[in-house]
Amino acid sequence: MEITKDIRYIGVDDHDIDLFEGQYDVSENGMAYNSYVILGDKIAVADSVDAGFVDEWLGNLEAALDGRTPDYLVVHHMEPDHSAGIAAFMERYPQAQILASMGAFRMMVNYFGTDFPERKMVVKDGDVLDLGGHSLTFVGAPNVHWPEVLFSYEATDKVLFSADGFGKFGANDIEDPEGWACEARRYYFGIVGKFGKFVQAVLKKAANLDIQIICPLHGPVLTENLGYYLDTYNTWSSYQPEDEGITIAYASVYGHLKAAVEELASALEARGQKVSVFDLARDDMAEAVEDAFRYDRLVLASITYQGEIFPFMSTFIHTLAEHAYQNRTVALVEAGSWAPTAAKVMTKELEGMKDITLAQNKVTVLGSLNDASRAQIEALADELSK
């Protein structure tokens, strides 16, 4: 695929994968592993692909080269879904040099038993690779989301090669009816979300560049309305709510807490609120995490279980904390048969999170819903709708 006259897409689509990174469901739309080739007077290949697709990738490269030979392999990110083809490339093109950060070369030793010492070029923030007619300026992007990561900027065509930044779930040969944001958001908060301050740092560097195209390592090449993507990443990485709305995440066993959640959701919607509800035992938890970060208010609803909270709720709260959840209002709903303590446990779990405002009202379901707990639901709906 031609991106510009001299920059081609040579990546692959994976329709066999069910879980990305062993946990994120991509069974419906698959995954793309992107790679690019820059055809200057000299030729640079940007990144490789996952191990199961190396032969296909090398075939795509051969077609794009049209009889020419690559001079460089540029490694922006060493995660195996982008680096598995390095050894095969270096064997096929013995004259080619390999460029990467020092951290990436250390990882190559771990993965391949060598860092190709006679052929390696260590690059860092601000270094430039002149290809003749095109050049790559390297931008240090540590911890977006691994420590060795580099971005690079091609000045002639104004292209940012953004490693895992601006990526999304889904193969590129399937049109996503929900557009870019939904699966990009799930990808960001699942993969990159913990490292917001590092994303902020690289966005500040990118602000000084005239970017017309963004080439990520997953998902589509971005060519239009780039301000939207940059602004969205700024919102996500600064942990600010993207939209006004309320996410309700619940864990219920016999249905009494679920009934309370349904009444609360209806009460909130009757007050004009946008509400998103997730059963943590049955729904995709990554989507629940996504919406918890998307909206400005969150309701955690859990039964009391062995004096603690239900395991799915514990995992959910732990995942939020692990991804630096902050700057939100959180309300609590608890249930139990004789001595509900879930709200107390959840409150303690939230204490380590930054800038969390607990709602003054809470809902306690003792056994099943009654007039008292329904009144608490109405009071909480009023508070969350102010």
Predicted regions and their residues:
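Conserved beta-strand hairpin/beta-sheet module of binuclear metal-dependent hydrolase folds
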Residues: 2-62, 151-154, 158-162, 257
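Metallo-beta-lactamase
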Residues: 2-5, 100-149, 195-201
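Metal-dependent phosphodiesterase/nuclease catalytic metal-binding core
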Residues: 37, 151-187, 192-215, 223-250
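Active-site metal-binding motif and surrounding structural segment of the metallo-beta-lactamase
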Residues: 41, 52-99
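Active-site neighborhood of phospho(di)ester-bond hydrolases with catalytic His/Asp-centered motifs
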Residues: 46-48, 70-78, 98-101, 160-164, ...
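Short acidic active-site motifs
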Residues: 85, 284-288
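FMN-binding flavodoxin-like domain, especially the glycine-rich phosphate-binding loop
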Residues: 172-214, 218-221, 263-278, 288-386
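Short, charged N-terminal beta->alpha structural module
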Residues: 249-271
